[in-house]
Amino acid sequence: MARVVIMDHPLIQHKLSFIRSKNTGSKEFRELVEEVAMLMAYEVTRELPLVETEVETPVAVAKTKVLAGKKLGVVAILRAGLGMINGFVKLIPAAKVGHVGLYRDPKTLEPVEYYCKLPPDVAERDMIVIDPMLATGGSASAALTLLKQKGARHIKLVVLIAAPEGVSRVEQDHPDVDIYAAALDPCLNDHAYIVPGLGDAGDRLFGTK
């Protein structure tokens, strides 16, 4: 069974408070989402393997450690996932970036794919799927399925806010995928919005509905 990790780091929780606030404008919202994404990237990559090496300092030779050549990929679920991309690639500049476009059918609430562009070597990479919200879990589950169809074997899902319904859906459909969230909120409302959540992340990031 997959792990569900709630990141309670003080900086993440502090910034998340301002992200939630309805009084936070698009510019500040974008900046905060990027900052929290970077903090989450730090935690998500905590278990990357290291190898020992040596470097020459101005004084002497030092024994150090570097990443063991593990290939990483980051996939944003459009459009709101775009707000988290920079936070990840600033910390992991060598990561390849993919995009999956999904929209939620207003009647069925199920995802419909309209775009998919992934690194060609996803089977060789540890993939990180990012999206600010895990509500019903439909979009996340569909994106994870797409990655697996392309050969991805090691995947993590990173979201700002999750609802129990979304967590259950991903656990049911993809029990091998660990979920990382900054917060787990109580429930969804009748419109499948996370309560209390933060509203529509895409609208708030880009100032358009």
Swiss-Prot record:
Highest taxon, organism lineage: Bacteria
Entry-linked Pfam families: UPRTase
Regulation: Allosterically activated by GTP.
Chain ranges passing through the membrane: none
EC number(s) stated in the UniProt entry for this protein: 2.4.2.9
Alphabetical list of SUPFAM superfamilies matching this protein: PRTase-like (SSF53271)
Claim: tRNA-binding is one of the keywords in the record: no
Coiled coil: none
Note accompanying the cofactor annotation: Binds 1 Mg(2+) ion per subunit. The magnesium is bound as Mg-PRPP.
Pathway terms, separated by semicolons: Pyrimidine metabolism; UMP biosynthesis via salvage pathway; UMP from uracil: step 1/1
GO molecular function: GTP binding; magnesium ion binding; uracil phosphoribosyltransferase activity
Binding site residues for uracil: I194, G199, D200, A201
Keywords for this protein: Allosteric enzyme, Glycosyltransferase, GTP-binding, Magnesium, Nucleotide-binding, Transferase
Cofactor(s) needed: Mg(2+)
Entry binding sites for 5-phospho-alpha-D-ribose 1-diphosphate: R79, R104, D131, P132, M133, L134, A135, T136, G137, G138, S139, D200
Alphabetized HAMAP family for the sequence: Upp_B (MF_01218_B)
Family under the similarity heading: Belongs to the UPRTase family.
Descriptive protein name: Uracil phosphoribosyltransferase
Species assigned in the record: Heliobacterium modesticaldum (strain ATCC 51547 / Ice1)
